[in-house]
Amino acid sequence: GQISGSGSEALSDGTHFAKEGVVFISNNRRLGAEGYLYLEELFGDGVGPGNLGILDQIEVLRWIQRNASKFGGDPDNVTLFGISGGGAAIQALVSTEGSKDLVHKVIPQSGGHSAQRRELAGQISEFALRRIGIKPGDIDSLQKTPWRIFPEIYEDIEALGLGSPQAYLPMISESMPFHP
């Protein structure tokens, strides 16, 4: 999902693709609260804008544009493939302005996509911070909080029943202007 996973898992092994002459690049992105917590309304502009996991993927695509040809790849023929949460992530990614002209084809496998409204993302973020004892605007406490605490409260957030069965999702925003 958007909570855990890695580009180094067995399903992300590109050996078989490489044997067929395909340049295969696997990546990681921030997940869970670190990738999708929306904090700007609670802490001000520039702090936790949400969608950091998506922005990570855009940076990977920019890297591919600059470097694919060095590995025999074609930067004008980039296909994204994702399984489960990775499939959902690439669906969100291609709905962003930042991915324009960086992606040419997508293969989302077994990953339906969901995004949340800014208001819902703000409610979830506010609850998460309250649950771990951080007051809005207390940036020092937030910075000292180990990120491993956020997965521990994931079930509490889902129990709120605010909408999606997943607490940390991409957010519809200026960078992702419509629901994929």
Task: Label the predicted regions.
Residues G1-P136:
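Serine-hydrolase-like catalytic core of hydrolytic proteins
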Residues R66, K100, Q109-P180:
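Substrate-access "cap/lid" subdomains that shape
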